[in-house]
A protein has these predicted regions:
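Charged, low-complexity interaction regions
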Residues: 15-22
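Terminal catalytic/cofactor-binding subdomain
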Residues: 29, 33-133
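Aromatic/basic-lined ligand-recognition segments
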Residues: 56, 97, 155-235
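Helical (often loop-to-helix) elements that flank the catalytic cores of nucleotide-handling enzymes
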Residues: 69, 116-127, 150-176, 237-252, ...
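Histidine-centered divalent-metal-coordination microenvironment in nucleic-acid enzymes
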Residues: 106, 136-152, 224-230
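Flexible helix-coil linker/hinge segments at domain or subdomain boundaries
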Residues: 136, 169-183, 253-279
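Beta-strand-rich recognition/accessory modules
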Residues: 212, 223-262
């Protein structure tokens, strides 16, 4: 009898008839942290609402500490300055150091876990505070988006990477040149990797050499129960950030039931976008084509 994968065993616990408390204890015994178990069970409890999801953003930028602290208070944005860490939280935006950012006053603004049902307002307030504080971005800064994905099966998880690979050439058209192809060592292309034989998370991890520095990070699932999208250039513009968050969330949702069989040839052919969203990304592609 074939040994069940990690994802299959987690799914078995999650879908059992036991109480939520019993499921949490079982997940912790299985090796997950209390936080990871909470995320998995939270996603399970809201999955009946197909449009609901959790997300988080990491905004790399340059901004003076004292100024942004004052502006955060004005916009009622809870913040905390911390050293470099990967701890998740549900209550405040944390500012951490990031050695990859070049320039004066480099910082990474990491959001708390946000919900699609209300989280965008909190994100907009944070962007307003950053912009009022004079935050700037450059070629060394990026925007990382995490989408809650703890309820994905192995097949669905693989689909996210395969589908992004099928979309990557089109996504490159509405990204800055510094984030296209493999122009950035912190978000390398997926196009050179063979994913066709992947069946679960561990197969994908092996293909990517267990490195997180790809346009889609295969390592964040184990640590956070998320899929991390790393390609977007640095930005403090709420519209650009929120549209990319929604793109990533829709890609994850699409991947639950679909695997693209060939490369997508244009933005207008991306199957999960609305006409309004296609218009936005076409506008971004035109901007980069002319600059």
């Amino acid at each position: 009898m074939a040994t069940k994968s990690f994802t299959e065993q987690v799914e078995e616990i999650k879908n059992s008839s036991a109480s939520v408390a019993s499921k949490k204890r079982a997940l912790i015994r299985f090796g997950l942290t209390s936080y990871e178990a909470d995320i998995i069970l939270k996603d399970f409890n809201i999955k009946a609402d197909s449009d609901a999801y959790t997300f988080g953003v990491e905004i790399e930028c340059l901004v003076q500490r004292g100024v942004v602290t004052a502006k955060a208070r004005e916009f009622s944005v809870p913040i905390s300055y911390e050293g470099y860490n990967h701890r998740d939280n549900k209550h405040y935006f944390k500012f951490v150091s990031d050695a990859s950012i070049r320039g004066e006053n480099p910082i990474e603004c990491v959001s708390p876990i946000l919900s699609s049902k209300g989280g965008f307002e909190k994100l907009e307030n944070c962007c307003n505070a950053l912009n009022e504080a004079g935050a700037a971005v450059n070629k060394s800064t990026g925007l990382h988006v995490h989408i809650g994905a703890a309820n994905l099966s192995g097949w669905q998880y693989c689909n996210v990477f395969i589908n992004y690979q099928r979309l990557e050439k089109i996504i490159d058209t509405f990204m800055a040149a510094s984030r296209r192809e493999s122009n950035n060592i912190y978000c390398k292309t997926l196009l050179n990797e063979c994913l066709a034989n992947c069946d679960d998370m561990y197969d994908v991890l092996d293909v990517f050499g267990r490195s997180r520095y790809y346009k889609v990070n295969p390592c964040s699932y184990m640590r956070h129960g998320t899929i991390e999208f790393r390609q977007h250039q640095g930005s403090t513009d709420f519209e650009k950030i929120s549209m990319w968050v929604k793109f990533c969330a829709k890609l994850v949702k699409f991947s639950k039931n679909n695997r693209l069989q060939e490369d997508v040839s244009s933005i207008n052919d991306i199957p999960f976008l609305t006409q309004k969203e296609k218009a936005f990304f076409n506008k971004r592609a035109n901007h980069f084509a002319n600059n």
